[in-house]
Swiss-Prot record:
Source organism: Yersinia enterocolitica serotype O:8 / biotype 1B (strain NCTC 13174 / 8081)
Annotated a divalent metal cation 2 binding sites: 174
Role this protein plays: mRNA decapping enzyme that specifically removes the nicotinamide adenine dinucleotide (NAD) cap from a subset of mRNAs by hydrolyzing the diphosphate linkage to produce nicotinamide mononucleotide (NMN) and 5' monophosphate mRNA. The NAD-cap is present at the 5'-end of some mRNAs and stabilizes RNA against 5'-processing. Has preference for mRNAs with a 5'-end purine. Catalyzes the hydrolysis of a broad range of dinucleotide pyrophosphates.
One Gene Ontology CC term in the entry: cytosol
PANTHER family tied to this protein: NAD-CAPPED RNA HYDROLASE NUDT12, NUDIX HYDROLASE, NUDC SUBFAMILY
Stored SUPFAM superfamilies: Nudix
Domain Nudix hydrolase: 125-248
Residues noted as binding a divalent metal cation 1 in the record, renumbered to the chain: 158, 178, 219
Annotated motif Nudix box, positions: 159-180
Quaternary structure and interacting proteins, as annotated: Homodimer.
Lineage: Bacteria, Pseudomonadati, Pseudomonadota, Gammaproteobacteria, Enterobacterales
Gene Ontology terms: biological process: NAD catabolic process; NADH metabolic process; NADP catabolic process
Protein name according to UniProt: NAD-capped RNA hydrolase NudC
Transmembrane domains' residue ranges: none
Residues that coordinate or bind Zn(2+): 98, 101, 116, 119
C-alpha cells in the first residue's frame, strides 16, 4: 500500500522514472527519508534488505538519475531489489490506462498489478524469458561480441524464448541461428532477474556437437573459440554471463588436470 512520507520513515530508497534510478554520489540512498528530502513523496514498500525496508518512489529527480547497471558490483540481493523497483516504476507508468477500454487504472493493494474498475481487467508486470548458454569445445569456450554491446566485451550467446517453445528448444535455436553450430549435453545452471528492461535470464551450459562456426552479422560482430586461459575482455562480475564463463573455465581446468594425471 502506498503512503505519503512524513520524513521519519527509514530504509533503502529506490527513486525511479523511465527506467532511470536516482543514485546520489553513485549509490542507492539509505537512511531516513528526511535526510534525502523525500518527505511528502508517495512511496510503497517493495521488500526488505538487511533488516531495513526497501521503498519505491515513482518520480524523476533533477540530478543524479543513472542506470541500475551501476549497482552491478554491489550485493546481488540489493541489485535485484533495485531492478525490481525500476521495473515496477516503469510498469505503473505504462499502465495508467486500460488497454481494453481506455479507462484509468489503479495499483492493487495486495499484489504487483494494475486494476481497471470499469471492465475488471487486471494487468501484471511483463517478464521476458531469455536463455543464455556457455558452449565448450574441449579446452575452448565460444565467445562473441554482440552488436548492441560496447567496449569490446566478449560474452556467451543469448536470446529470447519464442512463443510455444521450451527453454531447451530456445537454446538450440538461438545457438544455431547465431553461430551455425549444434550443441549437446545441455544442462541448466541458474537464473538471474535482468531489468534491461524486464528479462529473466535462464542460464545453461552445453558442449559443442557439430557444425562450422559462422556468426550472424545481424546479431554478432564476431565470434570465436577461446582457450580457457587466453580469454578476451569479459562481462563484469555479478552478471550471469560471467558466472557461466567462470564455471566453464573451472571445468576446463579440471579436465586438463585429470588428463595430466
Amino acid at each position: 500500500m502506498e503512503l505519503q512520507l512524513t520524513g521519519k520513515e527509514s530504509g533503502w530508497w529506490i527513486v525511479s522514472h523511465e527506467n532511470k534510478l536516482w543514485l546520489p554520489k553513485g549509490e542507492l540512498p539509505q537512511g531516513n527519508a528526511a535526510n534525502w528530502s523525500l518527505q511528502g513523496a508517495t512511496a510503497r514498500q517493495i521488500g526488505e534488505w538487511q533488516g531495513q525496508a526497501v521503498w519505491l518512489i515513482r518520480q524523476m529527480m533533477s540530478t543524479d538519475m543513472g542506470s541500475v547497471r551501476q549497482l552491478l558490483d554491489v550485493d546481488r540481493g540489493l541489485f535485484q531489489l533495485a531492478g525490481r523497483g525500476v521495473q515496477l516504476a516503469e510498469f505503473y507508468r505504462s499502465h495508467r490506462y486500460c488497454g481494453y477500454c481506455g479507462h484509468q487504472m489503479h495499483a492493487s493493494r495486495t499484489e504487483w498489478a494494475c486494476l481497471c474498475n470499469h471492465c475488471r481487467e487486471r494487468y501484471y508486470p511483463q517478464i521476458a524469458p531469455c536463455v543464455i548458454v556457455a558452449i565448450r569445445r574441449g579446452d575452448e569456450i565460444l565467445l562473441a561480441q554482440h552488436v548492441r554491446h560496447r567496449g569490446g566485451i566478449n560474452t556467451v550467446l543469448a536470446g529470447f524464448v519464442e512463443v510455444g517453445e521450451t527453454l531447451e528448444q530456445a537454446v538450440s535455436r538461438e545457438v544455431l541461428e547465431e553461430s551455425n553450430i549444434h550443441i549437446k549435453n545441455l544442462r541448466y545452471v541458474t537464473s538471474q532477474p535482468w531489468p534491461f528492461p524486464h528479462s529473466l535470464m535462464m542460464a545453461f551450459m552445453a558442449e559443442y556437437d557439430s557444425g562450422e562456426l559462422r556468426h550472424d552479422p545481424k546479431e554478432l560482430l564476431n565470434a570465436g573459440w577461446y582457450r580457457y586461459d587466453q580469454l578476451p575482455l569479459l562481462p563484469p562480475p555479478g552478471t550471469v554471463a560471467r558466472r557461466l564463463i567462470e564455471d566453464t573455465v573451472v571445468l576446463c581446468r579440471e579436465e586438463q588436470f585429470d588428463d595430466g594425471e
